[in-house]
């Protein structure tokens, strides 16, 4: 068969031509050739992709180089602005000290010259920047505080703006050291020399690493670049740390200001140098409008049967208080509407202003040789750290209220990668501290906020010592670490010893919080006290931490046994007064003192649970109380405008201090000698207990609702209806730090180790701060 087939199809037959329908002929050599061709194609494609990747890596490196350049430029400019801010503050302080020694005629001339120096127009600024650009062009970039990119602007990669777009900033930065607007030539020359030395140190620290970095970058891959970038950022952080040690805490120096009326427009808070006793210039033109009188209503679920409306001239049966103070004005509804307790109003009294002082107290338009519309502001810390007085220059510079606060905050966030939490108060011209009419301001600078009052009533601004804000036991700032959502207005707070639990008193109950675990958002227990609709006004722990005493809008005090498996009321003390505003415990834990709404001070024997004595003297409600460390002397403040001291051994009144305003809070310094008093007129007064001298402090904008000394006695805090928490140096009142909350701060307490502060506020929460030393 095979032979037949071979005959039919002989091998010598020529093959037919290939037809498209026939299958492709495969051979080993052809397959190898095809594989080789495909391999060469893939190899070429791989080579093309590799070139593309290398090009992208090169562009990435270029982008990173520009990022570092812009970061250096921003950082250097920020440092320069801080330095100039400090120079201006010192020069202002010198003016304030020198001008009063001049004759009245010369004072007017100098004041006018200073005011003219502050008025810098945009046209002048543009001319200055143009001159700097020309000088920069002629000098080929020498002398700039930060390096320029090594590439011409025309050859930059896409999406990179030409360097000319930032040349104005660079020129401005290089110009900062050479200009001053204050006519004191010798001082100016001295500060300029110091400033030049500082600039040289900055350039050697930040510019040189950048130059070496760029020179070697050509032969590095992106991994090497990343490690170098991290190293450089570490060096920049070290530079920042050195400036922080000099008192310019730019990262911590702004306060988060959340206004109830306009939450989108917070304002920079005042901060103060140890060398400068001054107020924020943004609060100097007009007093808050007087508040019309309104009734003070008792907390009640049945207003028709229990509400007691009192006019301003009647005795107050339930002034709003906290752990040791009442809340005095009518910003909030009565407790019956599930909000802040009723408040006692007093019309505002605008202080007198003399022409010389008023001309100097207007906000400085441009207090430094650079314009404010760049929108560069210092930034608060990631964890809500509070300000210390080194360099909060938003308040110092008085950036125009027309400037977009959001844009300014976004600029800070973009430069430093932090949340934009800082803005400006659009109504800053409405703010005025309660400065006495005879001392409305100090010529040449920010008005003083701390005054020494001599025995004959003479007031003088206080020159702060060099160690006012430094040294052992003096905080640098504080940061918010926890928020305790109580659910009702928190009128009373106290901290346990050791620091583990916080007790917050609201409407009808005290809630216990474990702050040793910051993640805990719920109270560990709730102690129902008084009636459900009556506010707790004060709660005090005995030193052993096993017993809590609670008082408020009721005639009874509740004594809680906290050592029981479940906290329980072990006794109740009943008085004849309808309300208790504040409590104090003797150091030996044997006696409790309660401030009654009828003005009496009740003395309770805690062991026998009986009333043993009443101190009578206040003609209106007793609002606040404190006891000396040795337990021999008691201090009380009242709505009758008096502060009284009592001898506990003899049971009699020792002293009486009369004021022109109601007393809402007080604290006795643990180390003795000084008594701090917070008043309705927004003042804090620090009295010497044996001498007639005292200090008067003016940073609060409304009534001072609570006050507490640190246990070391070196500082104290006060809170107010202006939403502020202020920390002061004992006794002269240098401002250590300031926090602004979102509502009236009704109460406060400090832990025994002075490491934590707790505040209670009208927005139904308590806030825990960690004190940073």
From Swiss-Prot:
It is found in: Nucleus. Pfam families: TLE_N, WD40. Coiled coil: none annotated. One of its GO terms (biological process) is Wnt signaling pathway. GO terms for cellular component: beta-catenin-TCF complex; nucleoplasm; nucleus. The keyword Repeat applies. The keyword ATP-binding does not apply. Residues 1-22, 140-162, 182-357 are annotated as: Disordered. Keywords: Acetylation, Nucleus, Phosphoprotein, Repeat, Repressor, Transcription, Transcription regulation, Ubl conjugation, WD repeat, Wnt signaling pathway. Residues 317-328 have a biased composition (Polar residues). It comes from the Eukaryota. WD repeats lie at residues 485-523, 531-570, 575-614, 617-656, 658-697, 699-738, 740-773. Belongs to the WD repeat Groucho/TLE family. This is Transducin-like enhancer protein 4. The lineage of its organism: Eukaryota, Metazoa, Chordata, Craniata, Vertebrata. The gene is Tle4.
């Amino acid at each position: 068969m095979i032979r037949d087939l071979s005959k039919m199809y002989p091998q010598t037959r020529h093959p037919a031509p290939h037809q498209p329908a026939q299958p492709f002929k495969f051979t080993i050599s052809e397959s190898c050739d095809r594989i080789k061709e495909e391999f060469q194609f893939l190899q070429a494609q791989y080579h093309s992709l590799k070139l593309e990747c290398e090009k992208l890596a090169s562009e990435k490196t270029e982008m990173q180089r520009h990022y570092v350049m812009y970061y250096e430029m921003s950082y250097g400019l920020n440092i320069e602005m801080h330095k100039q801010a400090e120079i201006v503050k010192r020069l202002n302080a010198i003016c304030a000290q020198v001008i009063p020694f001049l004759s009245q005629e010369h004072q007017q001339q100098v004041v006018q010259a200073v005011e003219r120096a502050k008025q810098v127009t945009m046209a002048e600024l543009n001319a200055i920047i143009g001159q700097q650009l020309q000088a920069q062009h002629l000098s080929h970039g020498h002398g700039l505080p930060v390096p320029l990119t090594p590439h011409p602007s025309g050859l930059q990669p896409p999406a990179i703006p030409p360097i000319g777009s930032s040349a104005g900033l660079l020129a401005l930065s290089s110009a900062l050291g050479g200009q001053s607007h204050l006519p004191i030539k010798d001082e100016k020359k001295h500060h300029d020399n110091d400033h030049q030395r500082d600039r040289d140190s900055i350039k050697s620290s930040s510019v040189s690493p950048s130059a070496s970095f760029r020179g070697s970058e050509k032969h590095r891959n992106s991994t090497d670049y990343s490690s170098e970038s991290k190293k450089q950022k570490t060096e920049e952080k070290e530079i920042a740390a050195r400036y922080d040690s000099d008192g310019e805490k730019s990262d911590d120096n702004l306060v988060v200001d959340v206004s109830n009326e306009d939450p989108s427009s917070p304002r920079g808070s005042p901060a103060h140098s140890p060398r400068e006793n001054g107020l924020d210039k943004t609060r100097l033109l007009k007093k808050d409008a007087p508040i019309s009188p309104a009734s003070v209503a008792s907390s009640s679920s049945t207003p028709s049967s229990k509400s007691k409306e009192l006019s301003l001239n009647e005795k107050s049966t339930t002034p709003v208080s906290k752990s040791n103070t009442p809340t005095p004005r009518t910003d909030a509804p009565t407790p019956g509407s599930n909000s802040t307790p009723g408040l006692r109003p007093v019309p505002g009294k605008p202080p007198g202003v003399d022409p010389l002082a008023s001309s100097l107290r207007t906000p400085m338009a441009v207090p430094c040789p650079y314009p404010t519309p760049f929108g560069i502001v210092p930034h608060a810390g990631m964890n809500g750290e509070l300000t210390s007085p080194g360099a909060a220059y938003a308040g110092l510079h008085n950036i125009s209220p027309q400037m977009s606060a959001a844009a300014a905050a976004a600029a800070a966030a973009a430069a430093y990668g932090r949340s934009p939490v800082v803005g400006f108060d659009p109504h800053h011209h409405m703010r005025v501290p309660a400065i006495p009419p005879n001392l409305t301001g100090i010529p040449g600078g920010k008005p003083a906020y701390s005054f020494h009052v001599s025995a004959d009533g003479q007031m003088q601004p206080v020159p702060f010592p060099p160690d006012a804000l430094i040294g052992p036991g003096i905080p640098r700032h504080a940061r918010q670490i926890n928020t305790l959502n109580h659910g009702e207005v928190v009128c009373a707070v106290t901290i346990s010893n050791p620091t583990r639990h916080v007790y917050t008193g609201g409407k009808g109950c005290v809630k216990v919080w474990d702050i040793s675990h910051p993640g805990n958002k719920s109270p560990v227990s709730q102690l129902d006290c008084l009636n459900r609709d009556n506010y707790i006004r004060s709660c005090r722990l005995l030193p052993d931490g096993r017993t809590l005493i609670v008082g408020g809008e009721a005639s009874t005090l509740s004594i809680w046994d906290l050592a029981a498996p479940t906290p329980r009321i072990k006794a109740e003390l009943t008085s004849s007064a309808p309300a208790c505003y504040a409590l104090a415990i003797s150091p030996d834990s044997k006696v409790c003192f309660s401030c009654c709404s009828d003005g009496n001070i009740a003395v309770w024997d805690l062991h026998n649970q009986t009333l043993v004595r009443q101190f009578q003297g206040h003609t209106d409600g007793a609002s606040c109380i404190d006891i000396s460390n040795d337990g021999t002397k008691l201090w009380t403040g009242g709505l009758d405008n008096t502060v009284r001291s009592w001898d506990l051994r003899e049971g009699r009144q020792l002293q009486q201090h009369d004021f022109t305003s109601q007393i809402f809070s007080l604290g006795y310094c643990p180390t003795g000698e000084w008594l701090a008093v917070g008043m309705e007129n927004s003042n804090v007064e620090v009295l010497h207990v044996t001498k007639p001298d005292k200090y008067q402090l003016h940073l609060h904008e409304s009534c001072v609702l609570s006050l507490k000394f640190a246990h070391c006695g070196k500082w104290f805090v006060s809170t107010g209806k202006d939403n502020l928490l202020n920390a002061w140096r004992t006794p002269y009142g240098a401002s250590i730090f300031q926090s602004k909350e979102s509502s009236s701060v009704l109460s406060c307490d400090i832990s025994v180790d002075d490491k934590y502060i707790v505040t209670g506020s009208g927005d139904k929460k308590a806030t825990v701060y960690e004190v940073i030393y």
